[in-house]
Each structure stands twice: as C-alpha cells, then as structure tokens.
Amino acid sequence: MLLRIAVQAKGRLYDETMSFLGESDIKLNAVKRSLLVQSSNFPVEVLFLRDDDIPQSVATGVADIGIVGENEYVEKNENAEIVKRLGFSKCRLSLAIPKDVEYPGVQWFEGRKIATSYPGILSTFLKTQNVNAEIHVITGSVEVAPGLSLIHI
C-alpha cells in the first residue's frame, strides 16, 4: 500500500515542500514534468497538482494527505482536516484601497465592488464585519482590475 501525498506542482509552496520531503528522507526520482512520482525508498507517491485542486483531491480520496496553503484549504471548504501546520510559506490576505484615500475602517467597503481570488474567505470576513459589498471573482492579476474599471477595489 502506498501513501499518496498531493503537493503543489509549482509556485510558492513547491520549493519548501520539496525541501520538507527531502528532510524527511523521501527520495523522489524524475520530478520534473511528472504528475505522479514514486519514492525510491518509501512506499510513497507524490502527486503534483495545482494548489487549488489539492483540498478536493484529499477530500475525495485521490490523495491520502496534501500539503497546501491554509488559504486554499479554507477557501475550498472541502471535507478534509488540518492534521499539522508545517510552519512554512506564510500567507496574508489583504484588502487594498486607493493610495489617495484615508482608510476610515472596513465600513469603507460598504456597497463597493471588490475583486478577489478568494470569494469564500472574503464573503465570510465581510459578513462578520456587517459589510455588504459586491464580490467579483478574478483568478489572476487581481491587482489590475481597478485600473480596468472592472471593480472599485
């Protein structure tokens, strides 16, 4: 029986995850351009996925465990649990406002259009703050959305 670990195929977590696996003495052969790699010294397979696919792969049993940022875990809200926080690759989600605006507090976002790659997390946060805003999902280059007049923030 093999333990299948889902990890990020590229991006911020990739290097730290590969170091973590190496420090755990899990030896992987031919990692580049492979989606599934078996360890040469342990009954372990490593499945390389997009970070936003990892929570679902664990929840559905495609992978036994996954290494993913907590932001993706919370956003996807899949039926999986955090077993251990590994302590690397911290993430901070922020709300941005125009430079020429003096920030009066979270109520500034009331009635505004906000672009995000994390609509679930943002929606939950805004509800806890009693702020009603229009959320627009953008999966990449969120920072350019205000300049294109797609959204306010």
Range-by-range predicted roles:
Residues 1-62, 78-84, 99-100, 128:
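N-terminal hydrophobic or amphipathic helices and topogenic motifs
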